């Protein structure tokens, strides 16, 4: 539409003109504006602005599609690091696709109540709120502006749990000192993505709740706190699928390879044992489209590329019994790996416990002797007691060292099972050659090049000589 400069002098005039030109109450118009808005966010990402906030739409669509939140069952969806709201708008679209001509007004109104997002930074929070408005969420009050990770560990209640979590938590960053200081000691970290994973598993998902999370390769192969988190994930949840994405999906923001982890929160098993809900993990290696060597701004990943994954996916209801291995898909028997590792490590752990108990017995004896020596003033009587204390303390320290060595030996056999950075065993093998053979071939090729060069020089010299001889004869 055309307006004169006079109408553009004040913000209110611009808003009034927009209201005249655009019917914001028309759903189709708002949906179109929502698409335009998301494209603008994509362009900002490609230009290097707000890049940390945007996940490619193909990824948000695919993850929402696979988690499959149900409108009929009124399943709630949360993104605890919602950025500009890409996952939430994908959930909105997924809910709306479940509407039909028979759907009630209550069904349509329910969509707005089933969403929750939390964003730490003001700009992406504003962009997210706008995004939700343009996608037909009239009162996006459920998009909160605060730091999810700064909420006290014990401040999360059962009412905060949701049916579905779909998110791309910031990875590679660290929270300020003090954030997460009340997390359980074995889960305490400042790495942002790790903190989100602890929250999702322990605080956000209901029993049988489903999640899809974007995580880098570093989470899959990481040890230390990451290994502890993966044990928590595999124990408390059923990690059924890892989609491995190629490089460049999130370029230019990052070229780090990323993965989509899909898992379901298991029911609590209170039988005194350490029950693991994950038995089998399926992997799917997403390939580049034919002719692609990477993704870029002009060649982004597309939702249509995930059609093979959708066709292969199957149903969790029958434990994905219809899945088959292929050039891109393979499964890992995690239960067998875990049981074998535990069996190999257990003797070392038992030995560590035995040595620790022996050390504790000696340390208790040392404490008793120290208590008894307090009432002995005679130096001659004290000396043998002090000597015994020194001997027992030395023996206890030696046992503690042996116990630590035994524990470490068991840990070295056990903890590698939590390296989930597993390569595709079904991929075509790359051709390899012996370096010595290649070097010999290279030398032979150089000799052939030299021989050809010398032959050309000889022929050129002969041709020039013939040319000059002919000229002299003509003269």
Question: What feature does the model see in each segment?
Answer:
Residues 156-475:
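A conserved structural/catalytic subdomain of Rossmann-like adenosyl-cofactor enzymes
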């Amino acid at each position: 539409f055309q307006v004169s400069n006079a109408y553009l002098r004040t913000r209110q005039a611009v808003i009034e003109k927009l209201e005249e030109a655009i019917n914001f109450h028309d759903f189709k118009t708002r949906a179109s504006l929502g698409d335009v808005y998301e494209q603008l966010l994509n362009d900002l990402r490609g230009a290097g602005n707000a890049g940390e906030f945007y996940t490619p739409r193909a990824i948000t669509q695919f993850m929402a599609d696979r988690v499959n939140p149900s409108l009929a069952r009124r399943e709630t969806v949360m993104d605890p690091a919602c950025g500009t709201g890409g996952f939430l708008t994908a959930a909105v679209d997924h809910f709306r696709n479940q509407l039909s001509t028979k759907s009630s007004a209550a069904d349509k109104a329910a969509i707005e109540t089933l969403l929750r997002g939390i964003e730490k930074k003001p700009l992406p929070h504003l962009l997210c709120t706008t995004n939700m408005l343009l996608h037909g969420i009239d009162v996006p009050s459920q998009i909160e502006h605060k730091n999810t990770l700064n909420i006290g560990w014990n401040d999360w209640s059962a009412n905060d749990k949701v049916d579905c979590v779909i998110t791309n938590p910031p990875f590679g960053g660290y929270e300020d000192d003090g954030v997460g200081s009340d997390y359980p000691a074995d889960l305490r970290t400042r790495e942002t993505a790790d903190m989100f994973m602890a929250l999702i598993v322990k605080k956000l998902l209901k029993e049988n709740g489903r999640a899809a999370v974007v995580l880098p390769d570093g989470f899959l192969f990481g040890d230390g706190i990451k290994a502890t988190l993966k044990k928590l994930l595999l124990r408390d949840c059923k990690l059924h699928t890892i989609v491995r994405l190629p490089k460049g999906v999130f370029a230019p923001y990052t070229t780090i390879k990323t993965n989509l982890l899909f898992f379901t929160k298991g029911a609590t098993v209170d039988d005194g044992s350490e029950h693991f809900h994950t038995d089998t993990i399926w992997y799917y290696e997403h390939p580049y489209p034919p002719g692609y060597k990477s993704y870029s701004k002009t060649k982004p990943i597309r939702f249509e590329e995930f059609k093979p994954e959708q066709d292969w996916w199957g149903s969790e209801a029958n434990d994905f019994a219809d899945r088959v291995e292929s050039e891109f898909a393979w499964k890992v028997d995690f239960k067998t790996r875990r049981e074998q590792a535990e069996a190999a490590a257990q003797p070392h752990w038992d030995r560590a416990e035995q040595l620790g108990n022996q050390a504790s017995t000696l340390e208790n004896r040392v404490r008793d002797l120290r208590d008894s020596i307090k009432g002995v003033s005679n130096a001659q009587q004290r000396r043998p007691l002090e000597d015994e204390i020194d001997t027992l303390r030395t023996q206890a320290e030696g046992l503690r060292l042996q116990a630590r060595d035994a524990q470490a030996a068991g840990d070295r056999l056990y903890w590698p099972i939590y390296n989930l950075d597993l390569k595709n065993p079904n991929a075509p093998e790359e051709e390899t050659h012996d370096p010595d053979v290649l070097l010999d071939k290279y030398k032979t090729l150089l000799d052939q090049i030299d021989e050809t060069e010398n032959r050309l020089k000889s022929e050129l010299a002969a041709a020039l000589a013939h040319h000059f001889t002919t000229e002299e004869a003509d003269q």
